[in-house]
């Protein structure tokens, strides 16, 4: 067998665990103003998937050191002067009010406020599967969908929405598109 020169420094693949759609307890790590959106950086904070997003980031950083991104981000879009403004404002108010009530924070969101005040806040977050096509790969990944109270999380009083499919998706292609061919089991295998 042949050896290769950088064997010792080559990264190994690690198990890539997929977060299932569902509801999880999350802790906000920071709140950042990012031009068009308030970005809440969070991680799961209880159960089997505790620290899921930080673990995924570390794993991705080992494999893709220049392009890895932290995926535990919930974006609340600021009004932009278009038809989605009312929805964006309602979503932002709903999320911020829930965070405030669940964590007994004393923040007046109608005035300028410091995003650091949200650090350490715990809430329930619903994730739904979202279909993707990226660099030739196709699949589903769980994405933040909305927030719920810790009581709703504990009692299971929430609904996980149906997966969000791509507009041009053909998730169940017919067999002709798969380009499979039948193998006659009576024939010898080619190796």
Protein language model features and the residues they cover:
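Short beta-rich binding modules
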Residues: 1-191
């Amino acid at each position: 067998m042949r050896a290769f020169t950088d064997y010792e420094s080559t990264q190994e693949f690690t198990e890539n665990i997929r977060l299932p759609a569902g509801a999880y307890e999350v802790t906000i790590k920071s709140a950042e103003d990012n031009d068009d959106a308030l970005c809440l950086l969070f991680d799961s904070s209880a159960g089997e998937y505790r620290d899921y997003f930080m673990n995924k980031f570390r794993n991705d950083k080992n494999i893709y050191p220049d392009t890895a991104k932290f995926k535990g981000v919930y974006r609340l879009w600021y009004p932009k002067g278009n038809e989605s403004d009312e929805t964006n404002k309602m979503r932002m108010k709903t999320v911020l009010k829930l965070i405030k009530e669940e964590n007994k924070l004393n923040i007046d969101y109608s005035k300028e406020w410091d995003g650091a005040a949200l650090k350490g806040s715990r809430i329930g977050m619903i994730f739904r599967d979202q279909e993707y096509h990226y660099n030739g790969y196709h699949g589903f990944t769980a994405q933040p969908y909305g927030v719920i109270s810790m009581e709703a999380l504990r009692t299971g009083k929430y609904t996980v929405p149906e997966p969000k499919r791509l507009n041009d998706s053909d998730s169940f292609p017919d067999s002709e598109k798969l380009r499979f061919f039948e193998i006659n089991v009576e024939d010898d295998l080619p190796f």
